[in-house]
Regions:
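Short alpha-helical elements
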Residues: 1-251
Length: 251
């Protein structure tokens, strides 16, 4: 058993969310454990230990669940369960948005670009978290896509999913009347840009540190150290899987 493997109780919680009772040659628990192992260790598919099912089968389920939205479903439900467990409402009232530019792997990938500000050639993760640092939404774009442009896509993706969301906090990189309009029209929320009043002195912006901490948490998962994926949908799924891995340990 590896440190990333699920306990029986943890697997039962995820299995209830997946809700697929078809008979299989290999238990879903073994397949999930293999994917969590890859997420944490950052290894290639073909290097999966023999204790797990074949890498081809594991990859098949990974892609199937990317396309079917299963990773997002698991991540969303676990977040609701965890929020309730710590005494909060299942749906958050505050979101915090930020981005992280990540280098791509050495071999050529589509959907990549150069972030002139961070001097990174690759892709950019745009994430929204709640006040616990739990993932609400993730979108991956080429690194040259401006934060304000990507934030529009994030807000559109979040539409209809968070009925209590009253405000989204952002830093000075997110500007534009359209973001304010989209937050109000799509989410019935306020989009608030929070900046440091004194640029000459470092100050922690209230609650902004939460999303920065979440990004640091994701960096503990070596599959996220670079972007190795052939498409951005898989890139987004690995962020969701990292979030699942962190939350399931709380149960």
């Amino acid at each position: 058993m590896y440190p990333t493997d699920l306990s029986d109780s943890q697997y039962k919680l995820i299995d209830k969310i997946i809700d697929d009772q078809r008979k299989r040659k290999y238990p879903l628990k073994n397949i999930l454990n293999a994917i969590l192992y890859i997420n944490k260790g950052g290894i290639q598919w073909r290097l999966l230990p023999r204790e797990y099912p074949s890498w081809q089968l594991v990859y098949y389920y990974f892609r199937k669940w990317v396309i079917g939205g299963i990773w997002e479903k698991i991540q969303s439900k676990l977040r609701e369960y965890l929020r309730i467990k710590v005494g909060k409402k299942s749906s958050p009232s505050l979101g915090i948005i930020d981005s992280q530019s990540i280098k791509n792997s050495e071999w050529g990938l589509p959907d990549k670009g150069f972030d002139g500000n961070k001097k990174v050639n690759g892709r950019k993760r745009h994430i929204v978290v709640d006040t616990l640092g739990l993932l609400l939404c993730v979108i991956v774009t080429p690194a040259n896509v401006h934060d304000s442009v990507a934030a529009e896509w994030v807000l559109l993706k979040m539409e209809g999913k968070f009925p209590r969301l009253a405000k989204i906090l952002a830093d000075g990189g997110y500007k534009g009347e359209r973001l304010i309009y989209l937050a109000r029209s799509c989410l019935k929320s306020v989009f608030e840009v929070v900046t440091r009043k004194d640029e000459g002195e470092f100050r922690v912006i209230p609650k902004r540190w939460i999303v920065e901490r979440s990004i640091a948490w994701f960096n503990w998962h070596r599959r996220l150290s670079k972007d190795y994926e052939a498409n951005v949908e898989s890139s987004e799924a690995w962020v969701q899987i990292a979030s699942i891995a962190m939350m399931i340990r709380k149960f």
